[in-house]
Regions:
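Short, polar/acidic, helix-capping and beta-turn segments at strand->helix junctions
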Residues: 1-153
């Protein structure tokens, strides 16, 4: 399952992670018709946050961009619990939340970590609508959270 996507990930030196266990009373993803909505995904690696803190105060925008990519991979893993990821017809919407220090306004650059990954993996089908939002705090002290909506063939 997910053979084509796994090949594309390997070509850019990445792999699909295990699904992150929810940290609350929710499921990783929900399907309605041909749309799948991921829950917000944190930059969890092997069950722990890769980093904590705020972007612009201890975490650089470059580090946060890499963390957004981790979030995007975790979102794909969550979505993949409900479908074969090779059946994704379109990345519809990406919403990125960035825990931002006062005065930090580079949220779009941070969320590009997710957007650029989807472009690399899905080509034109990776082009999506997007919001990049600065927030005061995120769950568990995470610097970035990403949620994704995909359409299936």
């Amino acid at each position: 399952m997910h053979a084509v996507l796994r090949e594309r990930l390997a070509a850019v030196g990445l792999s699909l992670p295990e699904v992150v266990a929810p940290v609350g009373a929710y499921v990783p993803a929900v399907q309605i018709g041909n749309l799948i909505y991921s829950s917000g995904q944190l930059p969890m690696v092997n069950g722990a946050l890769a980093m904590t803190g705020k972007v612009g105060a201890g975490i650089t925008p470059e580090q946060a961009k890499e963390l957004a990519q981790v979030c995007a991979l975790n979102a794909l893993a969550a979505i993949g619990t409900l479908c074969n990821l090779d059946d994704v017809a379109q990345i519809v919407k990406v919403t990125g939340f960035v825990a931002s220090a006062p005065g930090f306004t580079g949220q779009p650059t941070v969320v590009n970590g997710a957007s650029e990954l989807f472009g690399a993996l899905f080509g034109d089908a990776g082009k999506h609508a997007r919001s990049a939002v600065g927030v005061a705090e995120l769950p568990l002290g995470a610097p970035v959270e990403v949620e994704v909506i995909v359409a299936l063939r």
